[in-house]
Amino acid sequence: LMKEFADNDDMPLAGGVPTAPTGYNTDWFNEILNTAPVTEHNITANFGSDKGSSLLSLNYLDQNGIIGEDASFYKRFSTRLNSSYSINDFLSVGANVNYAYIENSGVATGINGYNPISYAYNIDPTTPVYDENSNDTFGYGVSPVPYSRMWNPIAFMDEAPKNKNITQQFFGNVYAEITFIKDLVFRTDFGINHRNFRGRMFAPKFFHSAECKEDNSRVEQSTNANSSWQWENTLRYKKSFGE
């Protein structure tokens, strides 16, 4: 139907490719989607005595994306430590510490329909994934339908910008409680939250058609770090009367 529309409307053709029957019947969703396995490991250890206890946990998650194959993934390593101990009758201490390392990468999805899913919906099945006779488009098949959004989804994923990000985050708190007398308790609590981000984007130059091209390669890098802390001190007195 899309081919007939282009023929009947007598519009200029994308890349100059004729709208004659091609003999192809490409399943574009089958071409762009892939199985995305998920691997996750968890280890938890508990330690304790009559003075207190600690819990240490480790987690590793590795998930591939359903689009982009090796170019799309999410990896995370995280650890957590919770502990509380009574030093003596009037002093107790504790800590809650968390750390995470995240690495993720993916094919740029863009906005306003400029992404592989949108292209797979819109491109006609008569376009082949690859065209060995088309050296000027790097061997990718070009749709005969004259619309800028008729981008070959495989070409888009191969040539579109690739993003790779690394995020590290540390947050936690340590505290101490001092019991001066039976009903009077002082607590000091110090917490911190630190996040560090590094991102990199690479967009290669390419020519897919007159409407789908990038004349220059681009590299963008960004870094961001922020920290915050909070220190709380409270004095609590609790007394019951009339019991």
Model-derived regions: residue spans:
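Outer-membrane beta-barrel architecture
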Residues: N42-N46, N82, N173-Y175, T179, ...
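Periplasmic N-terminal accessory/gating domains of Gram-negative outer-membrane beta-barrel systems
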Residues: N25-A36
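Outer-membrane beta-barrel channels and translocator barrels
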Residues: V38, S49-D50, S86-F90, T179-I181, ...
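Outer-membrane beta-barrel initiation region
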Residues: L33-T35, A45-S49
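A beta-strand signature from Gram-negative outer-membrane beta-barrel systems
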Residues: L1, V38-E40, S53
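Surface-exposed loop/interface segments of Gram-negative outer-membrane beta-barrel transport/assembly proteins
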Residues: L1-N25, L61, G65-Q169, R187-E243
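An active-site-proximal structural segment forming one wall of the substrate-binding cleft
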Residues: L184
